[in-house]
């Protein structure tokens, strides 16, 4: 039977406290795999695409069926191995080993190109896992809302005396990641104009309240933005158009936004960025009939897009790359100064990473939103003094639409992750929530990624491209007993530009789970503090000392013998 990437099937994760697998440690990855393909979550579930161009949850439908069958049958002392979305083996391990180990999209560096990957993909030998698509912990656009919110808030602190009121953000892309931008801007107090070339994506964001309004034309959009900024209102506006047309036009008109960024799927020129003048259907057809020509056309449009961003930057508008590698694509097309504006991590986020603060997330396997609201309250109780975090949780409850199983994103660091995990496990044990909770994170975290054009751009010691760190993170999480661990290549910025690791752990209310949580939710963020301390960041060294880390080559953390 030929392998199929298309099936007209609606998948939703089971809800409630009844198991379909043999334990919660195997039920959890089963439900989260299915949740990734829920039509309320995934961008194109019938083709197994979760987000980010062609980021898939399984290699093909036959592999999906086999994964579901394997997880249903998996014993408490067995581990399932997934190779680029394909279940390749079940092995006897032990009770505290991960139940699933995942490796997606990894290629020997010399061959780590889109061209070679696409050849393998066409032969059914590989799958692009993005970050949380192939690692089964995607929670919809909420997963990046807080990180984007924190970025915008910090930009307001740095450039506009601490407030974005009466300001507006210009950006593009309303896909799985980019769709978070308008809501994040609104929560940060700013208006936003987001350019998106697919009407279906705008419709989805309007329906889920991530976007407030759609403008009919550019003039209409600018009039709305002018009206709302004068009134001091934070309203998000979408425009169906091509960013490679609109941004240069805005430059020509002398329009001056207050912040400029971008979250189109520029990391994947074959599937993720519509060339100017093309229809989406034409783009899809030519991706098959003329892949090289299609990629070149997309990159030419990206070059025009980046040149406009450079022009805004030259005007003095704070302009930053939001991690889609569009600067690299433009540079390959001859825009030699493409990197004259920074990425968002060195510009705004790195101090958080130095303290192990990153995108901690959890999901209620029950499917009951009340379980998330109860955990929100528990977070406020434990992290009692962080009013900024409390404000985020209040806004999230009011504005964020759950996609699939109810979930929450909450940026916390080394000091708090273990404490929160243990508290959630106790809530499960006592019956305060109606079923177990899974805790995971984005691969975009402080110690789990090497990505010189994004998370590890401009490291103090020049170690941007050293990818030992995510490998060590994956190995340590495996040794610590995470429920499933993943190691991917190419997420966010595309083939050849990143390696990254993920972990998920189940809170099932048992003492054994508590022991695993103590190890995993300390060690995982501690690798981020370690990585930044090793690179020479004083803030990370201070955090390492405060949290009692032993880093043999960092003098301040030496243990007295």
Swiss-Prot record:
GO terms for molecular function: urocanate hydratase activity. Its main location: cytoplasm. GO terms for biological process: L-histidine catabolic process to glutamate and formamide; L-histidine catabolic process to glutamate and formate. Keywords: Cytoplasm, Histidine metabolism, Lyase, NAD. NAD(+) binds at residues 52-53, 130, 176-178, 196, 201, 242-243, 263-267, 273-274, 322, 492. Its cofactor is NAD(+). Pathway: Amino-acid degradation; L-histidine degradation into L-glutamate; N-formimidoyl-L-glutamate from L-histidine: step 2/3. Its EC number is 4.2.1.49. GO terms for cellular component: cytoplasm. It is found in: Cytoplasm. The active site is at 410. It catalyses: 4-imidazolone-5-propanoate = trans-urocanate + H2O. HAMAP family: HutU (MF_00577). Belongs to the urocanase family. This is Urocanate hydratase. It comes from Salmonella arizonae (strain ATCC BAA-731 / CDC346-86 / RSK2980).
């Amino acid at each position: 039977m030929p392998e199929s990437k298309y099936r007209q099937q609606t998948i939703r994760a089971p809800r409630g406290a009844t198991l379909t697998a043999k334990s919660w440690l195997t039920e959890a990855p089963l439900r989260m795999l299915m949740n990734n393909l829920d039509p309320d979550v995934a961008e194109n579930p019938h083709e197994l695409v979760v987000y980010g161009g062609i980021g898939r949850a399984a290699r093909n439908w036959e592999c999906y069926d086999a994964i579901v069958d394997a997880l249903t049958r998996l014993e408490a002392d067995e581990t399932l191995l997934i190779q680029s979305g394909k279940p390749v083996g079940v092995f006897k391990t032990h009770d505290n080993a991960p139940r699933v180990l995942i490796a997606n999209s990894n290629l020997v560096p010399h061959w780590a190109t889109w061209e070679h990957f696409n050849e393998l993909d066409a032969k059914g030998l590989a799958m692009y896992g993005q970050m949380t698509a192939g690692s089964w912990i995607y929670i919809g656009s909420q997963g990046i809302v807080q990180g984007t919110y924190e970025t915008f808030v910090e930009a307001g602190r740095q450039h506009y005396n601490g407030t974005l009121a009466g300001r507006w953000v210009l950006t593009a892309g309303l896909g799985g990641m980019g769709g978070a931008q308008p809501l994040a801007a609104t929560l940060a107090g700013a208006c936003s104009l987001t350019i998106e070339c697919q009407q279906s994506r705008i419709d989805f964001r309007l329906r889920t309240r991530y976007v407030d309004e759609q403008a009919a034309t550019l003039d209409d959009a600018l009039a709305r933005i002018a009206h709302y900024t004068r009134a001091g209102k934070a309203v998000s506006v979408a425009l169906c158009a091509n960013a490679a047309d609109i941004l240069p036009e805005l430059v020509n008109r002398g329009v001056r936004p207050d912040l400029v960024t971008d979250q189109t799927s520029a990391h994947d020129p074959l599937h993720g960025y519509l060339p100017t003048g093309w229809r989406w259907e034409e783009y899809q057809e030519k991706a098959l009939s003329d892949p090289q020509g299609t990629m070149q056309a997309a990159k030419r449009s990206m070059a025009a897009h980046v040149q406009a961003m450079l022009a805004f930057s030259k005007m003095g508008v704070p302009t930053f790359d939001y991690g889609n590698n569009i600067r690299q694509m433009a540079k390959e097309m001859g825009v030699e100064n493409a990197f004259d504006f920074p990425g968002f991590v060195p510009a705004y986020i790195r101090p958080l990473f130095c303290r192990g603060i990153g995108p901690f997330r959890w999901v209620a396997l029950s499917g009951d939103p009340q379980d998330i609201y109860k955990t929100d309250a528990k977070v406020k109780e434990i992290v009692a003094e962080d009013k900024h975090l409390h404000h985020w949780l209040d806004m999230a409850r009011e504005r964020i639409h759950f996609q699939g199983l109810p979930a929450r994103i909450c940026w916390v660091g080394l000091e708090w992750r273990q404490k929160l995990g243990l508290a959630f496990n106790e809530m499960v044990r006592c019956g305060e929530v109606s079923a177990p909770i899974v805790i995971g994170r984005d691969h975009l975290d402080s110690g789990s990624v090497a990505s010189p054009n994004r998370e590890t751009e401009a490291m103090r010691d020049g170690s941007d491209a050293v990818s030992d760190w995510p490998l060590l993170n994956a190995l340590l999480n495996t040794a610590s007993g995470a429920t499933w661990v993943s190691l991917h290549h190419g997420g966010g910025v595309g083939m050849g530009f990143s390696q990254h690791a993920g972990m998920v752990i189940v809170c099932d209310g048992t003492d054994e789970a508590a022991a695993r949580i103590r190890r995993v939710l300390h060690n995982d963020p501690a690798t981020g503090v370690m990585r930044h301390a090793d690179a020479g960041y004083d803030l990370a060294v201070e955090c390492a000392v405060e949290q009692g880390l032993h880093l043999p080559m960092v003098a301040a953390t030496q243990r007295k013998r």
